[in-house]
Amino acid sequence: MIGCFSMTQLRFGAKIGISELVCCFIAPFLFFIKYHEFKKDKVALYFWLLIFWVFGAILSDYINESFAAQVIRGFSVPVTIFSVSVCIYYNLRKNADGFKWLLFGIACSSVLSIFVFQRGIAGDLAAEGDISAAVESVIGYKLFWANTLMTWLTLPLFVAYLKVPRFYAVFVMAGLSVFNLLTGGRSMFLVSMFSLVLLILCGKKIETMRTVKKAFPIILVALLSLGLMAKYTYQYAVKEGWMGEAEIAKYETQSQKGTGILALLMSGRSDFFIGLIAALDKPLIGQGSQALDYKGYTGEFLAKYGTDQEILEYSRNQMQSNGMVGTIRSHSHIICYWMWHGVTALLFWLYVFYLSVSAFKNRMHYIPEWFGYFAITLPAFFWHYFFSPFGLRVNECALYCALLYLLKIENDRKRGYVSYGN
C-alpha cells in the first residue's frame, strides 16, 4: 500500500502524499512499540537524527521569524522522512522479500498519479476541475517519457535481478546511457554508465559482487574516467551538431566561463553554490525554511560567476516580481536542508551519505536479489544528493531503509546470527 500511493497527493491546504499521510499517523506508535528492535538492530541513530532535525527546524524557523507557510513546509520534511522510514523499515524487518512489492507499487503509482491524485501543477489543475489539462501537464513534462521508460525498464532488475538474463541488464543500461546522452542528460549519462559498469563487472555471482569492496579504489578511478569521457563525448557531439540547435545554444551558454569541470558545474549547477554560500553564512542555525534571499546571495553569485543568460533571467524575474525577495536557491539534498535548518539537518544528511557509501563499498552483496537495485539507484542517489532537490520522498526513503536493513544484517553477523543474505 505504501508503494501504490507513493506518488499520489491529497490537498488539505497543503499538499501531502496519501502514503505519507497514512505513515504520519502510524509511525509514532510503531516507533514507540518497536523501538527496542530498532535499537537492537543498531539503526535507531537514523531515527534519532531525524527527531533532532525536527527540533532544529523549529528552532531555526523561530530564530529566523519564518512565515507559517514556510514553517509547515520545512517542518514536514523530517517528519515525513521519519514517518515513512519507520513504516518501511518495520515491514522490511517482518518480511524483507516484500521489498520487491514496494518497488512494484511505486512503479504502478507513477502511472496512477497521471490520472488521479496528481502532484504539483497537475494537481492544482485537477482541483480546479480541468482533468484533461492536468493529465496533459504530466505527460507534457519534458522528462516524463524518459522517467517512465527508465522506471519500467529497470523494474525487472530491481525486483528479480537474479532471474533476469544478463544481456537484458546490459541492453537496458546501455540503451538508457545512449538515450540520456542524445537528449542532453549529461549527468544521467554518467550515472547510467556507472551502473552499466557495475552490472557488467559484478554479474550475478556472490563472488563477483564482492569485488566492489576489493576494487573500490579502481571503481573511483573508473568513475572519474567516466566523468571525463562524458564531458568530452558531449562536447564533441555538440560541436559536430549531432544534438540540435537547442543543445548547441545550451552548451555555448554554460561554457562562457570556461570548459573545465568546475566551470561547467558552476554554470550548470549554480544553485548548489548559491545554497552553499548561504549555508556557510549560518552553518549552525540555518537561514530558516524556504529562506528568503534578503542578503542577495543569488545576485552576488551570478554577478561573479553566472552566465549572461542566467543574469538576464534573474533580472527579468526581479522585474516581474516587482522587486519582491525570492527564496535562496540550492537544488541539493544536503545543501538545501543545511541551509534551511543548520547543523541538525546537516548531521542527518551526512549520516545518510555514510550509510550509502559504506553500503556501496561493503554491503551490496549481502542480499544478491537486491544487487541490481543498488547498482542502479546508488549511483543516481550520489548525484542527486549533491545536485538535485529532495522530491520523491517514498522512493528515497525506500532506499534509506534498504541501506538500514543491510546495516542490520551486518550487525547480526557480528553477533553470530545470519539473518539474511550471503
Regions found by a protein language model. Give the residues of each.
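Hydrophobic transmembrane helix bundles of membrane-integrated enzymes that assemble
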Residues: 1-254, 329-420
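Flexible juxtamembrane loops connecting transmembrane helices in multi-pass membrane enzymes
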Residues: 228-274, 278-282, 289-300
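A short, flexible low-complexity segment enriched in Lys/Arg and Gly/Pro that occurs
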Residues: 158-164, 254-269, 315-317, 323, ...
